[in-house]
Regions:
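Glycine-rich, basic loop-to-helix element that forms the pyrophosphate-binding segment
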Residues: 20, 45, 61-78, 96
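N-proximal low-complexity "stem/linker" segments adjacent to membrane-targeting elements
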Residues: 1-26
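A conserved acidic beta->alpha catalytic loop
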Residues: 30, 38-47, 87, 91
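Conserved nucleotide-sugar donor-binding catalytic segment
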Residues: 113, 127-216, 220
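Conserved donor NDP-sugar-binding/catalytic core segment of glycosyltransferases
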Residues: 91, 95-125
Length: 277
């Protein structure tokens, strides 16, 4: 059985598309199909698709109504057991990434790895290490990187495709429905899967995302649960503030002790001064 469908969507990002295609083609693991959905790009994307056409299982270049419409097109074409969405400009961490992952013999509904987020090139960015356990509170605060998340294709038939009325948060909504509400089996794999391009995450997009998430939460959960999530968020921020204050005060006390006379101050006295704040 075909294990994986890699779905790439693209719009006027020819250079990023080329990088993504090369990354997919270089994979030493080969039990996958590669689907590219292009939104009728006007740059060099079509030339790149034609150049690599013999290494792409299916591609199309036509108008769509947005990101999630394009992703849903890819899902409906897909034949693999799992779907992975690798946007144009994103690329695998190494040529043996998929081999490492599928040699684990995974069978969970959703499994997800880690990622490296970059803004300009892969040398400038940071790793995102995902949690082993996914909770409602985790999704309330953030999400998981969809470029490093493998989803059983049958889940889209069970719980519906991505909500095309949303601009940014439809994958987040799907994760909550599948993982939190319907308790799908998940597994975190300690493998870096992708470098992903975050240059499209503008402040405007963040505002839209927050608004959409608020609407989704109000539709899916009663107010009393949301109230508890907000309380947890406020408590966590308060604890973080307390910890920062403690560290700052400890630093100032230690600096003062050292400035006075380090050689004459026993270590136990130093520690007593630091922790008696």
């Amino acid at each position: 059985m075909l294990q994986l469908s890699i779905i790439t969507i693209n719009l006027n990002n020819g250079n990023g598309l080329r990088k993504t295609i090369e990354s997919v083609v270089e994979q030493t693991y080969k039990n996958f199909e590669f689907i590219v959905i292009d939104g009728s790009s006007s740059d060099n994307s079509l030339d790149i698709l034609k150049r690599f056409s013999d290494q792409i299982s299916f591609w199309v270049s036509e108008k769509d109504s947005g990101i999630y419409n394009a992703m849903n097109k890819g899902i409906k074409i897909a034949r693999g057991e799992y779907c992975l969405f690798l946007n144009s400009g994103d690329f695998f961490f190494s040529s043996d990434t998929l081999l490492k992952i599928f040699s684990l013999g995974l069978s969970e509904d959703v499994f997800y790895g880690d990622s490296f987020r970059f803004d300009n090139d892969k040398k400038k960015g940071f790793f995102i290490i995902e949690p082993d356990n996914l909770t409602l509170y985790h999704f309330f605060r953030k999400s998981i990187c969809h470029q490093s998340t493998f989803i059983k294709r049958e889940l889209f038939k069970k719980f519906g495709y991505y909500n095309e009325q949303l601009q940014i948060a439809a994958d987040w909504e799907f994760n909550i429905k599948a993982i939190i509400i319907n308790n799908c089996l998940t597994r975190h794999i300690n493998i870096p899967v992708v470098y992903y391009d975050a240059r499209g995450l503008s402040n405007t997009n963040r505002e839209i995302s927050l608004k959409e998430r608020g609407l989704i939460l109000n539709q899916l959960f009663p107010k009393r649960i949301l109230a508890d999530l907000i309380r947890l968020e406020l408590l966590e921020k308060e604890l973080l503030s307390i910890n920062k204050s403690f560290i700052f005060k400890a630093y100032r006390k230690l600096k003062k002790i050292l400035a006075n006379n380090l050689s004459e101050t026993p270590i136990n006295v130093m520690l007593l001064h630091i922790f008696t704040l």
